A protein has these predicted regions:
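Ordered hydrophobic segments in well-structured contexts
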Residues: 13-15, 53-55, 101, 108, ...
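Flexible, charged surface loops at secondary-structure boundaries
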Residues: 8-10, 93-96
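Conserved catalytic-loop position in the HRD/HxD motif
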Residues: 94-106, 110-111
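Short C-lobe core helix of eukaryotic-like protein kinase catalytic domains
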Residues: 81-95
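Conserved structural core of kinase catalytic domains
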Residues: 2-80
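C-lobe/activation-segment region of protein kinase-like
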Residues: 107-159
Length: 159
């Protein structure tokens, strides 16, 4: 099953159809919406009859996939790699593994004073779509190959 098949994605929001309310850890939703410092995008629950969806407001954000289309300065590359580490902090805080996607089209950025800040989306049962370890490796590689400084890029690739 492809993860993107269960999402409606546009420039302003992402909508994820949930199979059952039991799939959602309501404590995690509360934590996401109350703790802005975690780097998670706010979630709204939309219910229409038996259909339940999670709505993520992504207006004003850029996907990491789009961000990596341009070469990265050394400073922005380090900032992004630090942002990615934040993902593991989020998972340990929510006490739930596999709850954020490390795919580049599900990580969002907002630049503040020319520094990129990463924001993740909480997705129940993310692990049914992929292995975060594989996606983490792909993500690191995507950031590294976008670095414009050849020496730094080559050094990072040799690690």
């Amino acid at each position: 099953m492809n993860m993107e098949d269960e999402f409606i994605i546009n420039n302003d929001f992402i909508k994820y159809k949930v199979n059952s309310i039991n799939e959602i850890n309501l404590r995690n939703l509360e934590v996401v919406n109350k703790n802005k410092q975690l780097g998670l995008i706010d979630i709204e629950i939309e219910q229409f009859n038996e259909d339940i969806s999670l709505i993520y407001n992504t207006r004003g954000y850029k996907t990491l996939r789009d961000y990596l289309l341009n070469p990265l300065s050394k400073e922005k590359a380090y900032s992004l790699l630090n942002c990615i580490n934040k993902c593991y902090e989020v998972q340990s805080y929510l006490l739930d593994t596999g709850i954020v996607s490390l795919k580049t089209n599900f990580i969002f950025l907002k630049e503040i004073n020319s520094i990129p800040y990463c924001y993740f989306i909480y997705i129940p049962n993310t692990s049914k779509y992929h292995k975060n370890e594989e996606d983490f490796k792909k993500l690191i590689f995507a950031v590294i190959i976008s670095i414009e400084d050849n020496d730094l890029r080559n050094e990072a690739l040799s690690l």
